[in-house]
């Protein structure tokens, strides 16, 4: 299952659950008062088809296959030329007359002469009505369709689509996440009946005094739309030997019934057509019955091939427990998943799908029928983790009506007896741990008026809530003259969306009619305002543009090759319908996209490039905002001055420091060689609060050769909310009154140490008088590869006094001592 769920409401099922005939304007009522209607159309495009009975037939002269058939269609007898091989006298057939439209051949019928004989219509095969042979039995595919009517219940001349289950309309509802109760015919019928009852009550004169019924009131209309449970259906049967054990709080209720003498065969045509119109493929009579109950009552059922099952245990899955589902998909479970077992091994993934080993087979003669209530949260978590949604899991996720389980269970057993020759040998085993309840909600007329914007009549409020099956726990003869008097309400079990006062207001508003709400102009002036994060992103773009960068906007989709280049050995997100093979994986680094642009530029001899992108990188569990920029060639061209600034690692680092200064954060650099597409001697991780948030470096020669690049420099920085929501603090240092003292220090140090490490030690151990330290010379002779020469320049100043020579000498001695201690330097 994918996309936004819909529910297809079929007229023939719906009208069985309504107290009154269907309204002609059901489309408008549903759209205005219940939910969006995505489609409203006849079940079948076939028209003017009637039931006829074959009286006799005879061969047409000069034809090998054609017969002239006399057919009684109730009001008259017609003669029809037919070439079917399965004609039988006395059988009832589908007759199309002149003007009939047949969906299967997409044609309107016209009477005509065939072999010189005038034909007054056509005897129809099911395929000509648009039913695929894939879902027909071999007998139904032989020729014209012959009704099976041993009790002569189908009237001649009547609409032939009725016994086929193809008459009436279909209403396709758009189901919002909060209205799981509309995922069944009976759930929609309850809401529609409430709308119809409310429409009728609005026409009557309203009374000022209200007698609120208690929760046992008999006038709550929707309760009459639910078929009644037959308490004697299982009464005379012995107790079942099948034991049920529930070991998890995620299972509220579990019912099973053993049925024997089962005959697995195709379902009757009306049932197959009903499922097809609901978007469900028929399988066999047992599975089709469970699917019919699913769409009619919204209660998922499951049938097991009982085999040697002597016990049912509902438990949490074991860590790393593996299962194979009906569609032969393998899944690995953990202790957060719920399974149905036979006491030893799993036979179903609770609420989602059955397993292959316990599935219904053509040879099955004994089944165990299951009806249960599982925690919506547990089912939703398992479906999301396994990425496996079914029609059953959808209803468990949205919430089923626990009160309907016994009724749906009994209806399924009745259908199995009728359509599968089943024999019920034992009473059902019913195990109920707990019953879900809705919260009690208190609200008053004043709250309703403030939320809706105008006052509603108390009588209307009472009628609408009672019609919707709300229980009103309020003293009798309450007139609500005081607008602050409390109404204590409880929504029916099927309504999982009613949890707070505003949810009740939502029901009252839609029953009033959102299309009738008076428009009101908001008088309060509004002023748009950027958040600190949005401001920083906007200003960061301006900063980079002012530094000479061009902004790029690239696709979030990249090729597998570019993904591996900058995010190797990581789980990735691959889209099902890619634009092309080069656009199939969601990037985890913006550098993947920028290197492609860089390659495009260099192939066209454009080497002086500087561009950036601020966009999202996509990981399995989150999205990260990232800034990436690239440099190549000359960063600054001075033309005739001939003082160009070439792109380099240090230019790139300087730009990054400009960015970090703008953001008000301090970045540290960690030398690394882990990034295979960066030069091993010129790459570093970027750290913020000791967490790696980016990378900077020079492109590897192999990457250059592969993508036709000249020497380039790359940098990427993940912009977390912590970074973007940092308020920049400006530190002011007064202009010094006294002269600055400068000292130089030159020394040899091992090549394994960097200036950054030396600078950190100097900052940590030197008095406040040192205001700046600069590296102004680096030298390494070919003969001393293990040593390098650094020349540092120190700037000393004190705001309160003129520094004496001995003060500066003391600082220099301390600096020298610490450098010898930590790095074993040799003073030159």
Curated annotation (Swiss-Prot):
It comes from Aster yellows witches'-broom phytoplasma (strain AYWB). Residues 203-230 are annotated as: Disordered. Mg(2+) binds at residues 497, 503, 507. GO terms for biological process: phenylalanyl-tRNA aminoacylation. This is Phenylalanine--tRNA ligase beta subunit. Residues 436-519 form the B5 domain. One of its GO terms (cellular component) is phenylalanine-tRNA ligase complex. SMART domains: B3_4, B5, FDX-ACB. Tetramer of two alpha and two beta subunits. Its EC number is 6.1.1.20. It catalyses: tRNA(Phe) + L-phenylalanine + ATP = L-phenylalanyl-tRNA(Phe) + AMP + diphosphate + H(+). It is found in: Cytoplasm. Residues 736-828 form the FDX-ACB domain. GO terms for molecular function: ATP binding; magnesium ion binding; phenylalanine-tRNA ligase activity; tRNA binding. Binds 2 magnesium ions per tetramer. InterPro entries: aa-tRNA-synth_II/BPL/LPL, B3/B4_tRNA-bd, DNA-bd_dom_put_sf, Fdx_antiC-bd, Fdx_antiC-bd_sf, NA-bd_OB-fold, Phe-tRNA-ligase_IIc_bsu, Phe-tRNA-ligase_IIc_bsu_bact.
């Amino acid at each position: 299952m994918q996309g936004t769920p819909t529910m297809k409401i079929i007229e023939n099922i719906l009208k069985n659950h309504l107290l009154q005939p269907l309204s002609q304007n059901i489309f408008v009522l549903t759209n205005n008062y219940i939910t969006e209607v995505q489609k409203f159309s006849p079940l079948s495009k076939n028209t003017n088809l009637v039931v006829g009975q074959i009286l006799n037939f005879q061969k047409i002269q000069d034809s090998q296959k054609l017969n002239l058939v006399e057919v009684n269609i109730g009001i008259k007898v017609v003669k029809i030329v037919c070439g079917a091989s399965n004609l039988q006298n006395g059988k009832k057939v589908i007759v199309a007359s002149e003007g009939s439209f047949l969906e299967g051949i997409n044609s309107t019928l016209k009477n005509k002469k065939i072999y010189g004989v005038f034909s007054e219509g056509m005897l129809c095969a099911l395929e000509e009505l648009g039913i695929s042979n894939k879902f027909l039995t071999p007998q139904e595919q032989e020729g014209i369709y012959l009704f099976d009517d041993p009790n002569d219940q189908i009237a001649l001349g009547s609409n032939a689509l009725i016994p086929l289950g193809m008459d009436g309309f279909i209403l396709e509802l758009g189901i919002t996440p909060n209205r799981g109760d509309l995922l069944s015919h009976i759930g929609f019928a309850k809401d529609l009946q409430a709308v119809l009852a409310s429409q009728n009550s609005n026409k009557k004169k309203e009374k000022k005094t209200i007698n609120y019924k208690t929760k046992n009131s008999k006038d709550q209309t929707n309760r009459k739309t639910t078929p009644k449970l037959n308490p004697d259906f299982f009464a005379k049967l012995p107790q079942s030997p099948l034991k049920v054990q529930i070991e998890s709080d995620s299972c509220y209720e579990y019912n099973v019934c053993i049925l024997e003498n089962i005959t697995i065969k195709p379902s009757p045509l009306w049932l197959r057509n009903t499922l097809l119109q609901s978007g469900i493929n028929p399988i066999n009579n047992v599975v089709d019955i469970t699917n019919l109950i699913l769409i009619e009552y919204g209660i998922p059922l499951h049938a097991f091939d009982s085999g040697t099952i002597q016990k049912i245990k509902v438990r949490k899955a074991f860590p790393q427990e593996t299962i194979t589902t009906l569609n032969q998909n393998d899944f690995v479970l953990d202790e957060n998943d719920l399974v149905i077992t036979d006491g030893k091994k799993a036979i179903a993934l609770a609420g989602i799908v059955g397993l292959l080993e316990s599935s219904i087979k053509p040879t099955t003669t004994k089944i165990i029928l299951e009806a249960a209530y599982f925690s919506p949260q547990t089912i939703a978590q398992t479906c999301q983790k396994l990425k496996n949604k079914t029609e059953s899991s959808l209803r468990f996720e949205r919430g089923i009506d626990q009160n309907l389980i016994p009724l749906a269970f009994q209806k399924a057993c009745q259908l199995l007896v009728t359509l599968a020759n089943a024999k019920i040998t034992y009473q059902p085993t019913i195990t109920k741990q707990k019953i879900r309840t809705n919260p009690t909600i208190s609200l008053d007329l004043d709250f309703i008026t403030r939320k809706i914007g105008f006052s509603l009549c108390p009588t209307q409020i009472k009628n609408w809530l009672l019609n919707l099956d709300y229980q009103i726990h309020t003293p009798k003869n309450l007139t609500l003259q005081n607008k602050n008097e409390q109404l204590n309400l409880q929504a029916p079990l099927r309504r999982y969306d009613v949890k707070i006062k505003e949810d009740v207001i939502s029901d009252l508003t839609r029953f009033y009619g959102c299309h009738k709400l008076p428009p009101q102009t908001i008088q309060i002036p509004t002023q748009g305002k950027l958040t600190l994060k949005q401001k920083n992103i906007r200003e960061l773009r301006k900063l980079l543009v002012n530094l000479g960068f061009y902004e790029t906007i690239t696709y979030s989709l990249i090729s597998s090759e570019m993904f591996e280049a900058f995010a190797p050995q990581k789980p990735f997100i691959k889209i099902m319908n890619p634009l092309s093979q080069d656009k199939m994986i969601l990037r985890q680094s913006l550098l993947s996209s920028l290197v492609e642009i860089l390659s495009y530029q260099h192939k066209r001899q454009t080497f002086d490039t500087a561009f950036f992108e601020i966009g999202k990188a996509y990981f399995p569990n989150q999205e990260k905002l990232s800034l990436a920029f690239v440099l190549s060639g000359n960063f600054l061209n001075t033309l005739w001055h001939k003082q160009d600034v070439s792109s380099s690692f240090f230019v790139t680092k300087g730009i990054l420091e400009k960015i970090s200064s703008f953001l008000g954060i301090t970045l540290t650099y960690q030398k690394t060689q882990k990034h295979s597409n960066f030069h091993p001697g010129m790459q570093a991780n970027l750290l913020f609060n000791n967490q790696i948030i980016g990378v900077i470096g020079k492109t590897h020669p192999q990457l250059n050769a592969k993508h036709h690049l000249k020497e380039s420099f790359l940098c990427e920085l993940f912009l977390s909310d912590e970074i973007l929501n940092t308020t920049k603090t400006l530190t002011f240092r007064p202009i010094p009154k006294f002269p600055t003292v400068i000292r130089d220090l030159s020394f040899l140090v091992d090549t394994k140490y960097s200036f950054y490490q030396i600078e950190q030690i100097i900052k940590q151990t030197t008095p406040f008088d040192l205001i700046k330290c600069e590296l102004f010379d680096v030298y390494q002779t070919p003969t001393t590869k293990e040593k390098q020469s650094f020349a540092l320049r120190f700037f000393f100043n004190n705001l309160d006094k003129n520094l004496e020579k001995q003060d500066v000498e003391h600082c220099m001695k301390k600096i020298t001592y610490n450098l010898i201690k930590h790095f074993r330097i040799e003073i030159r």
